[in-house]
Every structure is written in C-alpha cells, then in structure tokens.
C-alpha cells in the first residue's frame, strides 16, 4: 500500500532528483515526488510499501543541499489538499498584481473613454501584422474633426495624449515598447472633450498603401449622436494580411512581473501566444530582469555517475554497456582488487542526468548471470577510482553553450563552490570489518595496524563474547575514501603473529552486526552470567556442557530435549550446529546448570536418537565455544570414539610388554616414529626397558628425534613420550625376569651403534635387563597369545636380521647369538634354527606384514601459537592417541612454532586421523597433518 510522507525544510534550489537521491535505496514510484514549496519548503513523497516509508522516516534530520529536512507522516488527502491550496494561492497572487500603469501620475481617464476599451476588437483579425510596420492599432482624434479615412499614416501619428486610453489591462500588453517611457514620463493633461456631432456615414476605406494591398473594408454604419461623449461602435474585422510576417515569435524569456496586470494570458481572441514575449521593436528589445530570464539549469556533475555492485568477475566494459542499453553511457570504469583482478564493482558515467535517473531504475536487474545493484555515485568517487574527466561545452536547453562546471581541484572550503553530495546520508560510509583479531587486541593495536590512516574518532569497535573475552571481530570507520581503500589493501597482513582479514562493509551493515552482538549478550541468561563471573567456581574449566555428535542432520531442538528427557535443560541452552547455508552438521551443543547434570548426560552415550547412535561427550564452556565457532567435521569414520583396546592379560596390560614399554600392539616405548619395525631398518627400533631412549634412537637421526628431544615449556607436558607402564623396578615385566645367569651382556652390548644399557637420558627408563642372550631358558608370554609368524634367532652376540626382516620370512636368523621368537608365543622350541632358543613374548602381528604395526607419529603444523595440549587432544578426540605423547615444538628462543608431534597406538589409527582431520581448523587456522 502506498504511504505518503511530508517533507519540510526543502531548499529552493533542490529538485525531485535531489529528493530521490536523499531516499536512495527506497522504492518511490514514478511521479511520486510532489514539491509544494511555500515558506516551510514542503514536499510530498509517495512510497510504494510500508517498509520503504518506515525506512524513509528514519532519515529525518538529514540534509538536502545543505538544508536540514524534517519528515512527517501524511496522507493522499492532505497531499492533494496542499497541492490544490498552493495552486489557488498562486492564482490569487497573480490576480492581485496591479497593472503596469497603476502608479502613473496624472488624472484618471474620464468615464467617457470607457467605451474605447472595445477598440482592440477592431484589430483582433489583423493576422500577425509586423510590429516594425504597425506601432499602434487604432487612433481616435480628440478634436471635432470627422474621421474620413483609416490608414497607416493616421495610425502612426497617434497623439501621445491617448496613452490613458491604452492603459487598460487588456490593451496595454499589446504595446510593451511604450510601457517603459509611460512609467517614467507622465502624459500631458487631457483637455475636456466637447460633444461630438453626428457622424456621417463613413466611406469605404481605400487600400492601405503597404504591399500587399489591403482589401477595402465594408462601410461603417453611421454613429448616432451620443451625448455627451459618443461611443464608437466596433468596426468590422479586417481581412487577414497575407503578406505580413507573423506577430507571434517564439518565446525567449518569461513574462516579467507587472507587464500583464492580471497575470493571466492576453485575451486578444486567443490568437496570440499567451507566453508572447517578443518586443515590438526587435532592434532594441526590452531588458528583462536577470532572475526572470530563462537560463538552462546548471548540471550537477554528481548527477552523471552511478555505482554498480555485484557484477560477475568476468564482466567487461561491453557487458556493462549492454546492461545499460538504450542509455547514453559516456565512460565505464571497472574497479579491481589489490591483485589487479575485477572485484565485481564499477562506476559508470552518463551524458545527462536523465540517463542517470533511468539507470537507477535498473537496480537489481540481471547482468549476465548475476543480479547487480545500481546506486548513485559522485564525481569524487569517479576521480578516486582513477576515472578521467573531460571538460566539454555543455549545451543547455536553449542551445547556448556554457563553460563546464569547475570541479577540480576542489578546495576544502565550501564557500564559492557547490557542495559535493558525497556527504549526504545515502552514502554507505567508509567502514571495514575485521576478522581474526588476537584475543588480547585493544584499540591501540588496531590503530597501530592502520597507522598513518585517518580513523574516525571513537569508531573502533572490538566485539566481546558473553565470557568477556574478545571474539576476534572488530569494526573501524575511516574519514575518507583514500584511507578506506588503503585499509582494504591490508587484508591478510599480520597483527602480531596473526593475519587479519579486512572486509568492506556498509555503515548500516556494521551497525546491524554490532546490534546483533549486543543482543546476543543481552539474551545470555542471568544464571550463565553469574556462573561465568563467579571467580570461586572457575566455571570455565568445569565440564558443564555436552557435545552430541553422530546425529541426523535434520535434528531439531525439540528432538535433543526429548533425548535429554529427565535432565533439567533450558531450551535456550541447546544449540544445533549448522553450516553457512543453514544445513545441519549432525551435531549439537548443550549447556547444563551444573556438572552433575552433565555427568548424567554421559549415560545417554550411544543411545538412539532418531535412529542413530548419539555420541555424548562432556566438555567445558571454553571447549563448547570453540566447537561452536569451528565445528569439527565428520569424516569417513564419523567423529571417532575410543574403541576398546586389546583384552588385558594378567601381568601384561594392553596386550604388550609394559616392562619394555609395549602398551599396545607394538613397541611404543621404542619410539618408532614411522611404522614400527621396517624390514630393512631395524636400527630404528629400541626397547626402552632395555635402556633405549623412548623418543627414538640417536643413530637413527632425522628431524623427528631432534624435534622430540626438545624440552617442553609447559608444566603439564612432562617428559616427551612418557608412555604408560612401569619402566623400572623389579615389577617391570609381567612374567618374572630371568635370573642373571641366562646370558651374558645386554641387548645393546652386542649391537654396534646402540646406546649401552642404562644410558637412557629419560628418568625411569634405564633398566638393566640381565641376559637377553643365548641360553636354554625361555621367557615367554601366556599360551593364549596367537601365533606370530616370525622367529627370533637365539644366542648372544649381535642383534641382526637377514634382508627382508619385515616381510615375514620363516626365520629371522640362523646363527647363534640372534634373537628369535616362537611361532605361537608359547613355550617350546620353534621352527627357527638354533638350539635352545630364548623366547620373548610379543604382541600379535609384531614386526609382521599382517595385523597392526607399532605406534605411529603425526606431525601437526600451522597451529595457533597459543594452542595448548588439551586443545590438541580435543582436536584428536575419538582417536587412539597415546596419553602423554603430545609434544609441542619451540624454537631456539623458547617461542612456540605452531608445530607438534602426536603419537598414535597404531598406523591405521594415525592414517585415519590424517584422512579425516587434515585441513581442519584449530581455532582460526587450518592445520596440516603429516604422517611420520
């Protein structure tokens, strides 16, 4: 429904285009702007919808052409009444204007002369006599002579004392050449007119001696005697003079005030143009008032430009011209980003404001395959974008050329120049949106980031979350466009050790985002604020939240509440995670009132939720916020949950040899950074129970050893790769340790390049294992262990293996002094050569081509420098990470490098983590996972 708004305070120099620019972005139909004027400078604007009118009312107090305007709600009835009242006031004012000779000195014309006002009817049919030939239309002698003839001679010698009779409003307009002297020189007094005798019949008028000849007039009937002043009857109209030029030249100026007493058009049988302004003497025309002369309106240079947003990046200048087909496009300038590519925006210059006005009607129309926005622009924007200005002689409506507007250079002083429209309310403002700010960032850091740029005072806004911590978002407004463009060029530059994203944003969009942030803070419940502001409880570290995963993508809040039935949960505390398109991610976050309720929710782990097993994990408030900002993605295996390990064996937990650091299906204590025991590189394996460093073997070399031996700077990190199990003492092995007489020397004694027993640099790892050498005794695991296909050769001496050790040959050595293993991990001799082998129980598939190899290390790169070990463990939640194996890397100055090493219990687990979590974010950065 159309809504009418009343505007007051409109300056006299403003037009409809200025009003439309003031309400740019709102829908005003054609013919919807009505300027009434008056003392208050009123105008009425008709908006297409209620929403447009509401947005328009919000612009009250703005300026049009430097004048502050006020907006009021109105109606169509009031608008029509005001327009009609203004029209009547104008007509009444014209009727009240006195005639041109109203101020003359001298006696008024006598009543007897009133009959002469009909004399103009005698010349109404003089079809366009030339003003240079005829200077008057009739003449009546004031003497007692009889009128014998009617000729141009008598017309041209009309006595000046007849000026009073020509002063009537209906006749004075026909002789404008005498108006000026009549106003300044008073006419002589008119003598009394004696009574005229009866006039004889007038003879026929001879032809006028002016070519072409004028046909004779019919005889004039005799005038009866009229006492005291005879009245002259109207004469018969003369036939048209075909040879005379027209009397009605085209208008050259508006009618000056006072020339026509009534202000109404001249009524000479309506044969003359009512706007006839040509003087009777073209050689010496009347000097009109400069204010009333017709001059072409000066063209505001800002009315020639429009801005186009949202164009396809592949759009060229021809596409823009095709989009504005039918309009006169002067030039097109496509804007580019800092790399030199089209950014989808551009400026277009037209030849006339009418073309600009028509171009604005094409807002939100299709260009190629995208809908573009067309908005007004200024010449200042055109110049700032690199556009060129060509000065041309602008042709006005009257065909007169006038110099181009002086627009460059513009001084800062507004005096003497037309003010630019760039400061009008419809401008978007020079605002930017910052993302990725450091959490400890303050206003001074933002000012330093945009140093040497002019920032609007108190315009820096840094967003904070409900917990009082910065969210990494911010807004800045600049004073001018040059600084604004320079700020956009600092996109992805570093503030401290984090790069900042700088995005353009309109001032309206900035205010909406700030308002949304404030509403988010206001909607946060009072209880939650109290809990977070309570320093005693340290709620941030309390696990009062739950992360529910592996649920259907179409899940809703009500479904989650029904799933948590029996646990008190506020509806506003349930958040279903969605992506940027509003599609569900199959995850939900729930915040409970206390830890007891959160622990109760763990009972629902792996319960069915809409047909799928829901995984419920209890997390802290900080974890919940991090998950809400960067939801973890579900890979092929989903959000993996811990799976039960191998069944425990008495004396051998986790189906390994904890005494030698074998917590699972390999030798994690051996510090195998790659695949456990590669076939040709057995030197990369070590037994920490036998005095080998758990982080690797120095002789192995490589980056990972040096990486893992760097001391951690965090107190909770502990020694690198401190694997579970007892690495020292008499109870290190599950089975009893063989007596010292079983063999001479230790593991490392017979192996060149291996560190000697007890030389481990890690506490608790230096265990002298007496007698893993040759001898007739066995050290074996329980009989329940399945068969491993490899054998270890027996006997003291070197520890070696033939080529292809990892590929599963029948035996790993036939000479005495080798270490072998039985096929069934049980007592009894194996098929491998060598008498009296010593059997060491190993996990299934150890150093074989089948089953799971040993622990595998993953290198994590490109992490935030402030990342903690807990955050890394949360990132790998659901994968079998060896506890205590996370090691952060620091440089020589002790600063974090954003890299870490994480050990997994098997290579399959590490491979799955790399496939599922590579390029996933930790904080605001995507991490890279490299399999060791």
UniProtKB/Swiss-Prot annotation:
One of its GO terms (molecular function) is RNA binding. Residues 304-379, 430-507, 856-932 form the RRM domain. Residues 783-811 have a biased composition (Gly residues). PANTHER family: HETEROGENEOUS NUCLEAR RIBONUCLEOPROTEIN-RELATED (PTHR13976). Residues 824-836 have a biased composition (Pro residues). Signal peptide: none annotated. InterPro entries: ESRP, Nucleotide-bd_a/b_plait_sf, RBD_domain_sf, RBM12_RRM1, RBM12_RRM2, RBM12_RRM3, RBM12_RRM4, RBM12_RRM5. Coiled coil: none annotated. The keyword Ribosomal protein does not apply. This is RNA-binding protein 12. GO terms for cellular component: nucleoplasm; ribonucleoprotein complex. It is found in: Nucleus. The modification Phosphoserine is found at residues 352, 375, 420, 422, 424, 525. Residues 97-116, 393-424, 717-853 are annotated as: Disordered. Keywords: Nucleus, Phosphoprotein, Repeat, RNA-binding. It comes from Macaca mulatta.
């Amino acid at each position: 429904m159309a809504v009418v708004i009343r505007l007051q305070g409109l300056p006299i120099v403003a037009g409809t285009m200025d009003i439309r620019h003031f309400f740019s972005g709102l829908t005003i139909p054609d013919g919807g702007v009505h300027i009434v004027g008056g003392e208050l400078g009123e105008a009425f604007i008709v908006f297409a919808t209620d929403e447009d009118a509401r947005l328009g009312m919000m612009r009250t107090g703005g300026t049009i052409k430097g004048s502050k305007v006020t907006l009021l709600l109105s109606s169509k009835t009031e608008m029509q009444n005001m327009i009609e009242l203004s029209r009547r006031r104008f007509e009444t004012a014209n009727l009240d204007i006195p005639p041109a000779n109203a101020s003359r000195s001298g006696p008024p014309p006598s009543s007897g002369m009133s009959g002469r006002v009909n004399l103009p009817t005698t010349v109404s049919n003089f079809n366009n006599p030339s003003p240079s030939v005829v200077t008057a239309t009739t003449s009546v002698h004031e003497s007692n002579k009889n009128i014998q003839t009617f000729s141009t001679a008598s017309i041209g010698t009309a006595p000046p004392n007849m000026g009073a009779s020509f002063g009537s409003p209906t006749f004075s307009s026909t002789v404008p050449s005498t108006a000026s002297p009549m106003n300044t020189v008073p006419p002589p007094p008119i003598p009394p007119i004696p009574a005229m005798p009866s006039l004889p019949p007038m003879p026929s008028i001879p032809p006028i001696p002016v070519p072409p000849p004028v046909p004779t007039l019919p005889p004039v009937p005799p005038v009866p005697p009229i006492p005291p002043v005879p009245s002259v009857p109207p004469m018969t109209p003369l036939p048209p003079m075909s040879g005379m030029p027209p009397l009605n030249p085209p208008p050259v100026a508006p009618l000056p005030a006072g020339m026509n007493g009534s202000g109404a058009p001249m009524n000479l049988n309506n044969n003359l143009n009512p706007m006839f302004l040509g003087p009777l003497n073209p050689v010496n025309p009347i000097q009109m008032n400069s204010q009333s002369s017709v001059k072409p309106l000066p063209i505001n240079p800002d009315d020639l430009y429009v801005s186009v947003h949202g164009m396809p990046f592949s759009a060229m200048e021809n596409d823009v011209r095709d989009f504005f087909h039918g309009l006169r496009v002067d030039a097109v300038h496509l804007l580019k980003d800092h790399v030199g590519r089209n950014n989808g925006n551009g400026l277009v210059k037209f030849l006339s404001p009418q073309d600009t006005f028509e171009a604005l009607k094409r807002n939100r129309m299709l260009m190629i395959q995208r809908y573009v926005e067309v908005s007004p622009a200024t010449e200042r924007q055109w110049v700032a974008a690199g556009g060129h200005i060509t000065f041309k002689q602008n042709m006005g409506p009257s065909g007169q050329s006038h110099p181009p507007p002086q627009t460059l250079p513009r001084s800062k002083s507004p005096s003497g120049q037309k003010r630019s429209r760039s400061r009008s309310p419809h401008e978007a403002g020079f605002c930017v949106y910052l993302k990725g700010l450091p959490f400890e960032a303050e206003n001074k850091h933002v000012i330093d980031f945009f140093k040497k740029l002019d920032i609007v005072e108190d315009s820096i806004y840094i967003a904070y979350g409900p917990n009082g911590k910065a969210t990494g978002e911010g807004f800045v407004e600049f004073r001018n466009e040059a600084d604004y463009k320079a700020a956009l060029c600092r996109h992805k530059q570093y503030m401290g050790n984090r790069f900042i994203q700088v995005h353009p944003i309109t001032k309206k969009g900035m205010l909406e985002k700030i308002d949304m942030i404030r509403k988010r803070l206001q909607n946060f419940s009072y209880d939650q604020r109290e809990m977070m502001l309570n320093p005693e409880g340290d709620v941030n570290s309390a696990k009062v939240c739950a992360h529910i995963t592996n649920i259907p993508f179409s899940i809703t809040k009500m479904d989650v509440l029904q799933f948590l039935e029996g646990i008190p949960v506020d509806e506003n505390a349930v958040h279903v995670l969605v992506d940027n398109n509003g599609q569900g991610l199959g995850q939900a976050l729930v915040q409970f009132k206390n830890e007891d309720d959160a622990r109760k929710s763990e009972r629902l782990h792996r319960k069915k939720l809409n047909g799928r097993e829901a995984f419920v994990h209890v997390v802290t408030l900080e974890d919940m916020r991090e998950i809400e900002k960067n939801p973890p993605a579900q890979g092929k295996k989903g959000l993996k949950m811990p799976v039960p390990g191998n069944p425990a064996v008495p004396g051998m937990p986790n189906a390994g040899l904890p005494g030698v650091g074998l917590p699972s299906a390999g030798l994690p204590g051996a510090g195998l950074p790659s695949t456990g025991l590669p076939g040709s590189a057995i030197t990369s394996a070590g037994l920490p129970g036998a005095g080998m460093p758990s982080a690797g073997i120095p002789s192995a070399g490589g980056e990972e050893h040096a990486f893992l031996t760097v001391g951690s700077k965090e107190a909770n990190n502990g020694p690198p790769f401190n694997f579970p199990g007892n690495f020292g003492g008499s109870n290190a092995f599950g089975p009893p340790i063989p007596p010292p007489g079983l063999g001479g020397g230790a593991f490392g004694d017979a192996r060149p390049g291996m560190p000697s027993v007890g030389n481990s640099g890690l506490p608790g790892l230096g265990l002298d294992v007496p007698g893993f050498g040759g001898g007739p005794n066995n050290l074996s695991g329980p009989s329940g262990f399945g068969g491993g296909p490899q054998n270890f050769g027996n006997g003291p001496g070197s520890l070696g293996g033939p080529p292809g050790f990892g590929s599963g040959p029948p035996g790993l050595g036939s000479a005495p002094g080798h270490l072998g293993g039985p096929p069934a991990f049980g007592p009894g001799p194996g098929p491998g050569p060598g008498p009296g082998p010593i059997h060491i129980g190993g996990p299934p598939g150890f150093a074989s081509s089948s089953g799971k190899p040993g622990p595998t290390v993953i290198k994590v790169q490109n992490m935030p420098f402030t990342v903690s070990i807990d955050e890394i463990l949360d990132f790998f939640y659901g994968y079998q990470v060896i506890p205590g194996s996370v090691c952060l890397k620091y440089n020589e100055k002790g600063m974090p490098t954003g890299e870490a090493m994480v050990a997994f219990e098997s290579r399959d687990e590490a491979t799955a983590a790399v496939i599922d979590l590579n390029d996933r974010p930790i904080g605001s950065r995507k991490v890279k996972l490299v399999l060791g």
